[in-house]
C-alpha cells in the first residue's frame, strides 16, 4: 500500500541525511550506539525491576557479547512507527511525531525497531498482501535499496535488540506505576 511505501520512504530519507551538512554533529554521539542503548535500557530495566525474570537476565548478559560493528551513522528517530507518522488525505507522509528518543546512531537498529510490527503482531501474509502490506523481506529490501546500505547477517540481532528495548520501556512504565510516579 501507499501508506507502507511512504513509511519506508520516510525512514529511508531520515537515515540518508548527512549529519554534517545539517550541522547535527552535536545531536548525539556518533559511535557505539547499540552499546549505549543496551546500557540505557538495562539500567532502566534493573531500576524498575518488579520481579526477576531469568530469561531477561540471560538476554542482558547475551546482548553485549553479540553487538555487531556499527557500519553507518545517521539521525535515528528511536520510535518510528505507523502511529508516529501523520499522513494527508492522499496517504502522503507529511510529518513524523514523537522525537524524544531521537539522536545520532545506527540506522539499522532504528529500522529494526520500526520493523517490530512483523514480529510482535501475527500477520497473515495472505491477508496482509490483500491489504497491500508488504512482507518484512520486501520491506527491508526496499529500505536497503533506498538507503544504499548493506545488511550482512545481523538482522536477527537488530530485532532481538529492539524487543529488548521494548521490554526495557515496558518495565520502566511498570516500575513507575508501582512507584506511583506514572504520568497517566
Q: What residue spans do the PLM features occupy?
A:
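Active-site activation/catalytic loop segments of kinase-like enzymes and analogous catalytic loops
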Residues: 108-147, 162-179
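Short, polar/flexible loop-turn hinges at active-site or ligand-entry regions and domain interfaces
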Residues: 1, 21-27, 121-128, 150-151
